[in-house]
Amino acid sequence: MHEMSLCEGILQILEEEARRQMFSRVRTVRLEVGELAGVELDAMYFGFDVVCRDTLADGARLEIVQRPGQAFCLGCGERVAVRRRFDACPDCGSYQLQVIGGDELRIKDLEVD
């Protein structure tokens, strides 16, 4: 489950930002997760709760905003929505798609004390 290591990385960022911005508690973490990022959302929620125990983010609420996958089709030259990597272009059927969005995972914002 790579979501656990993702959550550990998020916690590390939270701790660094707490030192830099001088806050002591995290109430809410909002993430943007692309549909093509390969993240299992249920595992992410679980991992976040486990990793954050006894830290500045203990009990923090995790909110995830999922971003749609987007690709550029080399076959027809269109920007298209895709739900999974290696899907065919919904317009022309080509498999020559280059992902241009929806593969990110980033902290959008925090609520802190």
UniProtKB/Swiss-Prot annotation:
Similarity remark: Belongs to the HypA/HybF family.
Gene3D superfamilies: 3.30.2320.80
Role noted for this protein: Involved in the maturation of [NiFe] hydrogenases. Required for nickel insertion into the metal center of the hydrogenase.
Any one GO MF annotation of this record: nickel cation binding
Residues that hold Ni(2+) according to the record: H2
GO-annotated biological processes: protein maturation; protein modification process
Keyword annotations: Metal-binding, Nickel, Zinc
Pfam families: HypA
InterPro entries with a match to the protein in the record: HypA/HybF (IPR000688)
Protein name: Hydrogenase maturation factor HypA
NCBIfam families: hypA
Cytoplasm in keyword set: no
Transmembrane segments: none
Biological source species: Alkalilimnicola ehrlichii (strain ATCC BAA-1101 / DSM 17681 / MLHE-1)
Binding residues annotated for Zn(2+), in chain numbering: C73, C76, C89, C92
